[in-house]
């Protein structure tokens, strides 16, 4: 009965899909739902790629770029949390690590902080207990130009509801 239930479940489908994609038993993943495993499989033929991680949060926990970093990729990690970026500066010191907000304009904005390192820190206020903090903001175009990034192979955007403003700030025809 248990085996029958497992085979008919959504989890069994995911298990089989992972097994097919990796052609082996599932290994450790860093992303919350093993997205990094899929990303790594898709990009496996690119040896020294470049990633841009907007809303990077943590260099290990939940990271969708750590596997790429371990394969000698490099990139830009951007987060509104100074504490998060300080962790990246220690663990990924060859990457470009920026403490700023990515928006559809250059200047300053405010973000709302739950705690110094928290996945829910956001440009969008979700509760009245959050601290309001002023921060520099730039478009992705400006950031890439200032850091002389001419192209990138992987873009990860996880900014708690402000993704559209990030996308508005990049010229995809250029990159």
Enumerate the predicted regions with their spans.
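Phosphate/nucleotide-binding beta-alpha loop and adjacent structural elements of enzyme active sites
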Residues: 1-175
């Amino acid at each position: 009965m248990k085996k029958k239930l497992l085979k008919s479940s959504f989890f069994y489908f995911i298990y089989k899909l992972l097994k097919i994609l990796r052609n082996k038993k599932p290994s450790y993943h860093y992303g919350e739902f093993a997205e990094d495993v899929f990303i790594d499989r898709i990009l496996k033929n690119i040896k020294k790629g470049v990633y841009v991680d907007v809303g990077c949060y943590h260099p290990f926990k939940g990271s969708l770029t750590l596997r790429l970093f371990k394969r000698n990729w490099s990139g830009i990690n951007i987060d509104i949390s100074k504490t998060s970026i300080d962790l990246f500066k220690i663990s990924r010191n060859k990457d470009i690590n920026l403490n700023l907000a990515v928006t559809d304009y250059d200047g300053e904005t405010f973000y709302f902080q739950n705690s110094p390192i928290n996945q829910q820190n956001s440009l969008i206020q979700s509760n009245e207990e959050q601290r309001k903090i002023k921060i520099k903001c730039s478009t992705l175009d400006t950031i890439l130009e200032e850091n002389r990034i001419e192209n990138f192979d992987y873009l990860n955007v996880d900014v708690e509801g402000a993704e559209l403003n990030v996308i508005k700030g990049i010229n995809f025809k250029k990159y």
